[in-house]
Amino acid sequence: MITTTTKKKAAKKRALRSPANKAYAFKSGLALKTWRQGKGIPRPLFAQIADCSERTLATYEGKARLPVKFSRPVEESIRLILALEELAGDNAALKEWLQKPNAAFDRRTPLSLIKGGEVDVLWGMVHQIRQGAFA
């Protein structure tokens, strides 16, 4: 007999495997490291985006399982990277854009916005571009 709890667990596993979540639902540090390196994102840059030290990121990338307290910032960072990459076109353009002063952000760099806790400004820009607000 299948219980409600079993059904909920199965549904949760399916959701984590769905294409929408597959890109950023990492459970292990090695999977995160492999993804980050595959995207060509240096550890110092990803650490800045995830708002952690480079040493902390290196430690967690060596773990078999990511700690819960670290999973959320990682998932949020990966979602932001994927959204910005979609708009920038490729990894090289994104890395350059993150470090270049932008008139839309009062000559601040997008990376400085991330460091300053103003990720919502970047998400607002992503939303506006996706909706065609600048067309």
Predicted ranges, named:
Residues M1-A135:
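Non-transmembrane "mature" sequence context
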